[in-house]
């Protein structure tokens, strides 16, 4: 795919939890807990205009869902700030210093005075209905590993509450994560390829990680990707779970926008008119149905209704992403707005146990060959679903709508809500402006000394090639490598090879290489009990509870003493000559002799 000719532009928003002693706006510890909560409370959110007199469209979208929110907390690690019953405390200075340090890494312009803002969030993940956020710096640019990275903004904000469960219209959150300091780095629009965007995301994430102030573990880093193409629209894709998924997410979003533009062109060519949200009851068409999907609704006292979609024949079933069709997009809207499980459409019928005869009956009753079927017991939900489907269909001729979408595990995306507007952000009235003091700058200078290039230089000085050093930095093994180098007198390059190459090769064979096995092998190498050539075979064959030395003895792979190596080399040199001796000795005694010992013995032989 020629992304440049398509006008692909991408942007990243990288969110990283900071490892601080307290939360951002209170003094509770930022720890996640799995024990039974001490209390639960219930809240409902209601729409109101912001201090600027406007209502955000994303707010209207969420509030219309009429949801009930339950919050779980702990008396010893949750306070009234999280419950929105006490004013927030002053921001954590440690978190602020880290944000300033990251700004310096990317040469961003710092604000002399930082104002705390409220960002409207009404999915229930913030008890107050807003997230507190501080814009720390803007307009940064840095060249790292050959990439020119423009940073639009660097913000410090509080993380949201943790979703525990969702049951119908009730969503259960836990307050332990609410308020954990989170740094957000938003890039300028980029014209890089999807694979290059993944690299940029890694660089940004590691630049924060290398400060030593970032939390580690699952869920501590979250990536949002903004994607647009010429003629399309800016789409924000939330929660890409893994860096390696970024290229696929971008590729599939480009496909989706291209396909939506094709659908728009076809609708214009057909001269399709407005879809009205009026419903036709077609329940009688399924009086004797064998479809389990339909029978389940009818047995619960529900009904089946049809929404006429004239002019959409063969377009409802048009693929927009792998395994996802335009009808799937409509079903996403229904699920996002209502409690209905989705919809069926004429392009996928007969199917789901619905017969061709039943389809003809529905078409006759609806008075249309193209239609959407909705099923349920709640009349209000059916009407809501019809309205949202009609609204999306009427927007289809205009091309790609601006949306916030969620990333699926396979790289496709689903609709979450409309893109938020400017009315989403307004000033926090409970916290005075925060000045960047000399003390904060001093702390930031210390943190900002770390860099990717600095870490590469440190690793290459140990004898690693630049490629191996970069591979190690990108792997999850860097900390382990540094610990092992400090503990064992083994060349760092050998340790890196075991962690990066040998372990991976054995894992492909189904061999589990534990930390204990690696430690035992390094101990044997340090004691000169085995050679580096024997490492893979020893790891492959180590039994449970067996040391590397014991395994090597059992396998006949104990390191040959140097005196024996000299004797062997003398014999081989006599037999095949000095030039061929190294290869011949290594072939005969592979795993038992060290190549450096053989080279030394050859150099010491004089006939």
From Swiss-Prot:
Pfam families: GAD, GatB_N, GatB_Yqey
The keyword Transport is assigned to this record: no
Protein's UniProt name: Glutamyl-tRNA(Gln) amidotransferase subunit E
GO biological process, one term: translation
Keywords on record: ATP-binding, Ligase, Nucleotide-binding, Protein biosynthesis
Leader peptide range in chain numbering: none
Superkingdom as given in the UniProt entry: Archaea
InterPro entries: Asn/Gln-tRNA_amidoTrfase_suB/E (IPR017959), Asn/Gln-tRNA_Trfase_suB/E_cat (IPR006075), Asn/Gln_amidotransferase (IPR018027), Asn/Gln_tRNA_amidoTrase-B-like (IPR003789), GAD-like_sf (IPR004115), GAD_dom (IPR029351), GatB_C_1 (IPR042114), GatE (IPR004414)
One Gene Ontology term of the molecular function aspect: glutaminyl-tRNA synthase (glutamine-hydrolyzing) activity
Known role: Allows the formation of correctly charged Gln-tRNA(Gln) through the transamidation of misacylated Glu-tRNA(Gln) in organisms which lack glutaminyl-tRNA synthetase. The reaction takes place in the presence of glutamine and ATP through an activated gamma-phospho-Glu-tRNA(Gln). The GatDE system is specific for glutamate and does not act on aspartate.
Gene3D superfamilies (UniProt xref): GAD-like domain, GatB domain, N-terminal subdomain
Disordered: region residues: 399-428
Organism (species): Pyrobaculum neutrophilum (strain DSM 2338 / JCM 9278 / NBRC 100436 / V24Sta)
Catalytic reactions of this protein: L-glutamyl-tRNA(Gln) + L-glutamine + ATP + H2O = L-glutaminyl-tRNA(Gln) + L-glutamate + ADP + phosphate + H(+)
PROSITE patterns: GATB (PS01234)
The encoding gene: gatE
EC number: 6.3.5.-
Assembly description: Heterodimer of GatD and GatE.
Protein family per UniProt: Belongs to the GatB/GatE family. GatE subfamily.
Any one Gene Ontology cellular component term annotated for this protein: cytoplasm
